[in-house]
């Protein structure tokens, strides 16, 4: 009898242990996905979140994470689908629903569905208290719908709620993307009237002057930021020097940035590659881009990969540039500049094929050197 009882107790304990182990594994998978998302490893994060969804672990949260990963990877319709699935789950908290609606509106905007995005923005406005970020999102959606007055009203609300350098720059960039820089410049001018308080403020002021193409003031503000310990200011100073065609000074700034920065080195290598391209040293540019890609997270890769296309094009290696551009467009399908680059490369390759027709059947082919020797 005692043996049987002990056996039953052992069976229960083993079963509980197995259940705990299974739950622990699911928890670890989810936590690792969260870490990957925070670190910019979006493909790994997506895999982890999808595993969590399949295992019915934190389903709404996992669908949210998968949606964010897809959004960062450029799969905008996939992101919309994930956020929609998350919203359809039982017992989604009100705060999470707000978060999901905002993310879905962002994905819909990027997927070219501004009407759907505006519907979610209107739901947010009716069901929740609006904040600066939601006003800004609604302004971006209105801008995409050519509803300029509505966009302006929402941007004003956003800036009223959060009158800082970051918001001023975001509004400017939103207008700039639509070729309406003048509408955004007034926000830059407004924030420049505030007094800087620390190195970060001076750095942001320098960035703003750079956008306004006031390079002397940009240098002054960024130099102050650097003197106060801002490493980011060194990279921005490199951008300013490049804009002034001073590649030697720019190269020095980017090298100083690489020497001072411990983690985000990709930005420095990208800067050196830009200096190389400006100087016509395309092979060196490709070497620096390769170094940058090794150090880059997903967010930093885009500019490096685009500049890799440019370097191959400048080398007149149009076939490699075209192949790289095709890969790039799969990753960043909404990049209009890259789309134009791809079309140019396609036409350039077609032009080369017309200029160099294939030999007729049965015709011998010979190199230029062989032809020269025959003629001699």
Segments the model singles out, each with a brief description of its role:
Residues 57, 91, 95, 129, ...:
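Short coil turns that delineate tetratricopeptide repeat
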Residues 27-28, 61, 95-99, 133, ...:
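Start-of-helix register in tetratricopeptide repeats
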Residues 38-39, 72, 110, 144-145, ...:
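Register position in tetratricopeptide repeats
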Residues 18-21:
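C-terminal motif of bacterial Sec signal peptides marking the signal peptidase cleavage site
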């Amino acid at each position: 009898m005692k043996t049987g009882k002990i056996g039953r107790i052992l069976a229960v304990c083993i079963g509980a242990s197995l259940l705990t182990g299974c739950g622990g594994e699911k928890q670890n998978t989810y936590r690792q996905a969260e870490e990957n998302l925070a670190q910019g490893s979006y493909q790994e994060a997506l895999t982890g979140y999808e595993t969590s969804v399949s295992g019915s672990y934190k389903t709404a949260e996992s669908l949210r994470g998968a949606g964010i990963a897809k959004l960062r990877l450029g799969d905008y319709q996939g992101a919309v689908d994930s956020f929609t699935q998350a919203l359809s789950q039982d017992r989604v908290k009100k705060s999470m629903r707000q978060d999901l609606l905002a993310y879905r509106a962002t994905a819909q905007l990027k997927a070219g569905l501004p009407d759907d995005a505006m519907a979610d923005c209107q739901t947010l406005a009716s069901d929740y208290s609006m904040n600066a970020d939601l006003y800004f999102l609604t302004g971006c959606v209105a801008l995409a719908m050519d509803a300029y007055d509505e966009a302006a009203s929402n941007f004003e609300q956003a800036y009223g709620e959060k009158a800082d350098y970051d918001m001023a720059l975001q509004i400017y960039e939103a207008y700039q993307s639509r070729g309406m820089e003048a509408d955004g410049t007034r926000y830059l001018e407004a924030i420049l009237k505030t007094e800087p308080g620390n190195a970060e403020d001076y750095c942001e002021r320098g960035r703003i002057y750079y956008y306004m193409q006031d390079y002397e003031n940009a240098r002054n503000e960024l130099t102050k930021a650097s003197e106060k310990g801002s490493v980011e200011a060194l990279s921005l100073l490199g951008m300013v020097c490049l804009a002034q065609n001073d590649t030697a000074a720019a190269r020095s700034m980017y090298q100083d940035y690489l020497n001072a920065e411990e983690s985000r080195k990709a930005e420095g290598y990208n800067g050196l590659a830009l200096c190389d391209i400006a100087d016509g040293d395309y092979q060196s540019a490709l070497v620096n881009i390769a170094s940058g890609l090794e150090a880059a997270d997903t967010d930093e890769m885009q500019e490096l990969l685009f500049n890799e296309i440019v370097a191959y094009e400048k080398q007149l290696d149009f076939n490699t540039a075209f192949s790289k551009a095709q890969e790039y467009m799969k990753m960043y399908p909404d990049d209009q500049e890259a789309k134009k680059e791809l079309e140019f490369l396609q036409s350039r390759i077609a032009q080369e094929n017309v200029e160099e027709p294939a030999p007729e059947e049965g015709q011998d082919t010979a190199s230029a050197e062989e032809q020269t020797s025959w003629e001699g």
